[in-house]
Amino acid sequence: MADGDIEIKAGFVDTDLDDRKLTMIDDLNNPLAIVERVYLIWWHWADFHLHVISPHIDTITPAIVIEPELISGSNDHEFVYSIHDSGSKLSTSKSQDMFSAGMSMCKLFYTIEKMVHILVDRLKSGGVSMEEEVQIAFAGHEIAQRKAFESIINLPYNVVVTNFDPGIWGEKYLQNVKRLADKGYGYPPESPRENYKHPVSSATTARK
């Protein structure tokens, strides 16, 4: 009986392996499955780029790397990724945390808030008025672009994103904003925001 049991179990194992091989082959031949997996990988190291088209901003070569700064009054650094500053272009990505961050976009969103803050500081130092039209363009992961768009439309400056169509997502976003406002929760805070300067360790301790 014991030998028979072993043979049966071995047969199950062989069948299971064969099924998995067939599934794997089907996935490799399925364009949609491949696209889905590539998108999932991209989500883990999502990047974002902000280009200033107009007004003209001088290019910085080589790019300056802006590291997370120490937050005043604490031992924590800003909860952001490194930002590569090329003058007219700001770039960042989750690549340094791709294995630990997983699909979380929290740190990237805070980094985007800082990039928008840098953009505004650059406009102020360049003497650009709030009424003057500023044209920018996005590149990178779709979710990161949506976050940047949300921050940009809440700026007091006349900033226009030339290559981003909010589409159905934009309509739903505005509907949700209005619904929350009608319930008394107010509207999103004006940009630029400094929420990325919130000490991470103290927030974690408070939750515990």
UniProtKB/Swiss-Prot annotation:
Main location: cytoplasm
Keyword Transport: yes
Stretches for region Disordered: 184-208
Location in the cell: Cytoplasm
Superkingdom, taxonomy of origin: Bacteria
Keywords: Cytoplasm, Protein transport, Transport, Virulence
GO cellular component assignments: cytoplasm
Biological role stated in the UniProt entry: Component of the Dot/Icm type IVB secretion system (T4BSS), which is used to inject bacterial effector proteins into eukaryotic host cells. Part of a subcomplex which recruits effector proteins and delivers them to the core transmembrane subcomplex. Is a critical subunit for binding a subset of effector proteins. Recognizes more than one type of binding motif. May be a critical factor that confers host specificity. Necessary for full virulence of the bacterium in guinea pigs and presumably humans.
Descriptive protein name: Type 4 adapter protein LvgA
Natural source organism: Legionella pneumophila
